[in-house]
Amino acid sequence: IPRNAEIVMELIDSKSTTYNLEDYNINNLIAPVQPPISKSESQNNINFEFNENLYGKNEFYSKDLIKIKKKGLLRELEIANIIINPIEYNPIENKIKVYHTLKFKLEFINADIELSQNAKNRTFSPYFESIFQTSITNYNSIFETRNNDYIEDVVSYIIIADQSFENALNPFIEWKTQKGFHVTVAYTNQIGTSATNIKNYLQNQYDNPPNNLPAPSFVLIVGDTQQIPASYSSGGHVSDLDYCDFTNDNLPDVLCGRFSAQNPSHLTNQINKTIEYEKYEMDDPSFLSDVLMISGVDASYAPTYGNGQINYGNNYYFNSNHNINSNTFLYPASGSSGAQILNLANQGAAYINYTAHGWEDGWADPAFDNGDANSMTNNGKYPTMVGNCCLTNAFDTGACFGET
């Protein structure tokens, strides 16, 4: 959305079909959608919500047919979702109206294109440009675009570190500089040790980058929470999101990560693994074609959501069409497959995905915890692991599973 624009939506044409649900042997009311609930919530505490007033009206009901919902600024680009609700329901007549064709126009009134383009130019990053072009439907029609030039485009990479890691960081800084990044290292004894000090430093680097540099594309935090506090931890899961959100809308404006090392030895291990991946120096890279997909024991959710998520990944991404072999464990069989899963992980997998319950020290069922991780023999075959579960990356609680 261009800056300062008022969005006007005009419905140009629509085609719909009305269906009598009795013709399809549907004689009961369609249940209303329920609000989201936490997986940790007891089923006994969940109330079924039903609006008797709406269900008593003899009219077709739907939320706005087409709605624009603003999300915020993503690296100075204001973005929004177009939400389409193509089904209307009349509970009294037991009919639904389905819109199968919608043609509409969005117009941006009083748009300041120059201001929008200047903001984009100030924060241009080839690493965000590909995100914008593939994720924002009207991006190319609003902004001037160009091909990324990874040779000429300066990419700013900021490292925030505790000074105790200065020597251990050198190989990583040298490697990133060799790749072409402009690396700036700020030690907390210089900029301050509090979350506020760090956020203020990063905010200034983004708003007023020095020496004609662009706004940073990457921020790397080096140190565990004992050395560098998380940007957010009060009342919820620990997070560094605030360090990379400069417009207070929960959208990251830089790509942010953390080496949560407690000492230089930990950091050296993390750096060595990272550089090995980026230089493609594995002794046997054949493991990169193997993935491990696990829908764990989560009885009330696993049959639909756990298995569904794993099957979705396999159907669209992790399959022979992409030269990937997926070792898949669906619920309920996954519950008795713990030993087999650990064995496959030790053999090497590029990607491991688990969805079910978790805790700070690991995945719950089938169990895969810190003890298992510390005993692994997959040297040189390190996976990217994704846990769709609670607490496994709570990096403010000793050595959590994500850190181990």
Name each model-derived stretch:
Residues 1-188, 197-218:
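Extracellular pro-sequences of secreted precursors
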Residues 75, 150-153, 210-215, 248, ...:
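Extracellular/periplasmic catalytic domains that process cell-envelope and extracellular macromolecules
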Residues 85-87, 160-164, 186-191, 221-225, ...:
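Active-site-proximal beta-strand/loop segments in catalytic clefts of secreted hydrolases
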Residues 157-185, 252-340:
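A domain-level signal for caspase-like cysteine endopeptidase catalytic cores
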Residues 167-169, 192-196, 227-233, 300-307, ...:
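Extracytoplasmic/secreted cell-surface and envelope-processing proteins
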Residues 181-216, 315-351:
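Functional beta-strand-loop-alpha-helix junction segments that form "active/interaction loops"
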Residues 201-242:
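Hydrophobic or amphipathic alpha-helical targeting/insertion segments
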Residues 242-277, 355-404:
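Catalytic cores of nucleophile-dependent amide-cleaving enzymes
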